[in-house]
Design a protein with these regions (language model features):
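An amphipathic, basic-hydrophobic helix/alpha-beta surface used to engage anionic
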Residues: 1-74, 78, 110, 120-123, ...
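Short, flexible loop segments at the rims of nucleotide/cofactor-binding pockets, characterized by
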Residues: 2, 97-101, 125
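Von Willebrand factor type A / integrin I
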Residues: 113-117, 129, 135-170
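Short low-complexity, flexible loop/linker segments enriched in glycine and/or proline
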Residues: 80-81, 163
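Von Willebrand factor
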Residues: 84-119, 131, 151-155
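Short amphipathic alpha-helical surface micro-motifs
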Residues: 4-7, 103-105, 128-132, 147-149
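Glycine-rich loops and low-complexity Gly/Arg-rich segments
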Residues: 23-26, 48-51, 88-93, 146-150, ...
């Protein structure tokens, strides 16, 4: 016994090696190309995703990304390492989606189908969707820890009083 030999208590502290998988589901639809205060919603989502990604590598976790609109635009499988994170951030900054619409159901169903082991999934979106995604989210939440982060601009809810104006749906 170490305590008996050295005549003082010996405490060994174990640090858990978690190696979680973190998935970022990033909405790249046209509704994120809006911003009035300091930045576009797309830039805000990218900044949040980059912060989460760097936090994941600090914990030695794997990080993966699903870019989605009304379809899966791109999937980057979870991996570890700084090089992988920099690749993900470069993709986030340069990504050009094929569609402007949003289907959150498709993204969550893809997550449950592709990621086999339990993970922590962050959904970054403005959640301007036409379909109800609550049932699919509950199914995904049985297997994964799903966290929704809403990217929001206050002007999206309050239109300025400027009279008649032309509005185009993305």
């Amino acid at each position: 016994n170490v305590t008996a030999r050295f005549h003082h208590p010996f405490v060994k502290v174990f640090e858990e090696e978690r190696e979680l998988t973190v998935m970022l589901l990033i909405d790249v639809s046209g509704s994120l190309d809006f911003g009035t205060t300091h930045q576009m919603k797309r830039d805000m989502a990218t900044e949040i995703a980059a912060t989460l990604a760097f936090s994941a590598i600090q914990n030695n976790d794997k990080i993966g990304v699903i870019f989605f609109s009304d379809r899966i635009e791109q999937y980057i499988a979870p991996k570890k390492g700084r090089k992988h994170i920099l690749y993900i951030i470069r993709e986030m900054l340069d990504f050009k989606p094929e569609s402007k619409k949003t289907d959150l159901n498709a993204a969550i169903e893809f997550l449950t189908r592709v990621v086999k082991h339990p993970c922590t999934a962050f959904v970054l979106s403005d959640f301007y969707v036409r379909s109800d995604f609550q049932q699919v989210l509950q199914i995904a939440n049985r297997k994964h820890d799903v966290i929704a982060l809403q990217v929001y601009d206050p002007r999206a809810k309050e239109l300025p009083d400027v009279g008649l104006m032309n509005v185009t749906d993305a």
